[in-house]
Regions:
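Active-site substrate-recognition segment that forms the wall
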Residues: 3-8, 114-206
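A structural motif corresponding to the C-terminal end of an alpha-helix
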Residues: 80-84, 201
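A structural signal for short hydrophobic beta-strand segments in well-ordered beta-sheet cores
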Residues: 15, 92-94, 161-164
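Core beta-strand elements of the Rossmann-like FAD/NAD(P) dinucleotide-binding domain
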Residues: 103-109
Length: 206
């Protein structure tokens, strides 16, 4: 077996700026249950059930919502696949017999899962795709003695999420920056903006 502690089905609380629209969101989620039973049980609850959070009166709760440490998930999937992992820049060249050459090796089929690099991978082959990098910044906070592990993920309407983890950790974000390319430089202005928005829902960040 594999360690799956990076995944925790903590539930999710979804918010609407107009909470009268929660009923419609509930009905939409219900229609998805048959094909996605992992959504879990659905209910509209009062904010009093989540005293740690503020800024709303009601929320839609889905018990199947979960938080995940993405890097650990990726590493586990790669390990479980049993495939050889080769790190580095690759080039893809189609051959006349319908196969593909990648860095000196030949393959019958190729699955491209290169995310934001898809465009530059396909460009030499004459393809254009509307795929671009999007920079996403998160900010982590740690609260000593706070039982954050029992809290659900909070998803207000918009781009911000408040993601509690066990051990007093709270993550807020992410930013969705379409004009930064592959620049991974931390932008303090963006992080300050995320914090200010998150305080609406989790005042303990102050």
């Amino acid at each position: 077996g594999y360690d799956t502690s990076f995944y925790d089905q903590s539930g999710v609380a979804l918010l609407k700026k107009d909470d009268n629209k929660l009923g419609g969101l509930y009905q939409h989620a219900e229609t998805r249950l048959e094909e996605s039973p992992i959504i879990g049980e659905l209910s509209i609850k009062n904010a009093a059930d989540l005293p740690e959070f503020t800024g709303f009166d009601r929320y839609l709760y889905a018990s199947g919502g979960a938080r995940v440490e993405g890097a650990e998930l990726t590493a586990t999937l790669i390990e479980a696949s049993g495939f050889e992992k080769v790190e580095g820049l690759v080039t893809l060249s189609p051959l006349d017999n319908g196969t593909y050459e990648i860095n000196g090796q030949t393959f019958d089929k190729v699955i491209l899962s290169c995310g934001a690099w898809l465009g530059q991978t396909l460009e030499p082959l004459g393809f254009e795709v509307d795929v671009r990098p999007q920079k996403g910044q998160l900010r982590d906070y740690f609260f000593e003695g706070m039982d954050t592990g029992r809290l659900p993920v909070l998803m207000p309407e918009g781009e911000l999420d408040v993601i509690p983890f066990a051990g007093g950790k709270i993550s807020v974000g992410a930013s969705h920056e379409n004009d930064q390319g592959f620049d991974l430089t931390v932008d303090g202005t963006v992080l300050a903006s995320l914090e200010e928005e998150a305080k609406t829902y989790f005042p303990d960040l102050s």
